[in-house]
């Protein structure tokens, strides 16, 4: 399993995600995260990767440059390593 740490305005939340599992499926049980479409087509759930990698190829909202800057659509992100993500970043776009 991969260790996921979400840095939220209310503090850090850490949990494990199995390979191939969307982090939101676990995170939504542990934190009050902003969600809307849950399909990677909007920016409500936007976060920024501090460390680690995710697969967010299902998403359509972010362009390559935004992804290179570390932005991540947490609703569709599948961790590919241990990962640390800052949540609640929609206002930055």
UniProtKB/Swiss-Prot annotation:
Q: Where in the cell is it found?
A: Plastid, Chloroplast
Annotated 2Fe-2S ferredoxin-type domain ranges read 2-91
- Note the SS bond partners: none
Tell me the InterPro entries matching this sequence: 2Fe-2S_ferredoxin-like_sf, 2Fe-2S_ferredoxin-type, 2Fe2S_fd_BS, Beta-grasp_dom_sf, Fd_pln
- Give the matching CDD domains: fer2
User: What function is annotated for this protein?
Assistant: Ferredoxins are iron-sulfur proteins that transfer electrons in a wide variety of metabolic reactions.
| Protein name, as recorded | Ferredoxin-2
Species source reads Equisetum telmateia
